[in-house]
A protein has these predicted regions:
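Patatin-like phospholipase
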Residues: 1-62, 74-169
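Catalytic nucleophile serine of serine hydrolases
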Residues: 67
Length: 169
């Protein structure tokens, strides 16, 4: 079951026409760690029904993601999205790391995985599509003062809430 949150006019239109690919201007893939693995069924349907990158015109779409959500959005924008998506799933679930897991082991492993998942044709499609843009959000934090981490985190959350309130009214 999908829950639609929409204004009165939009809800009336959704009930009349259903949700159509041309109604979607932004597709978001949040950072989720391995939780993204619950989405393959939904993602496949979205790709098959044209909710990924507009292939034959159909407006312009922004695909936004961070972390694993960015990888999903890259697959949506690939030359052959379903094939790239299947390679992404296979590559992700086959990762193994020595214990304890360290960033110095994880980062190169994921770089290798992504290089195997996305072909040169995919990269061309992702970077040059006339009807879609992919935005990847990345944050890298260096915390020289461990005691300040919590304060910085709280400040960032507060700032995000303030921007959200200003943006949505």
């Amino acid at each position: 079951m999908l829950l639609y949150r929409a204004g009165h006019r939009a809800l009336k239109r959704l009930r009349r026409d259903g949700l159509r690919p041309e109604d979607v201007r932004v597709l978001v893939g949040p950072a989720s760690g391995p939780k993204w693995l619950i989405f393959p069924g939904v993602d496949r349907v979205l790709m098959e029904k044209g909710f990924g990158v507009p292939r034959n015109g159909g407006g312009h779409r922004l695909l936004v993601g961070s972390s694993a959500g960015a990888w999903r959005m890259l697959a949506f924008a690939a030359r052959r999205p379903l094939e790239a998506y299947e390679r992404l799933i296979d590559g992700y679930v086959s990762q193994t790391f020595p214990m304890p897991v360290r960033a110095k082991d994880v980062t190169p492993a994921y770089r290798r995985m992504l290089a195997e998942v996305f072909t040169d044709d995919d990269l061309d499609a992702i970077t040059s599509h006339p009807h879609a843009d992919v935005a990847i959000h990345v944050t890298r934090v260096f915390d020289p003062y461990p005691w300040s981490y919590r304060a910085a985190q709280i400040a960032a959350i507060a700032m995000g809430m303030a921007v959200h309130r200003l943006w949505t009214g």
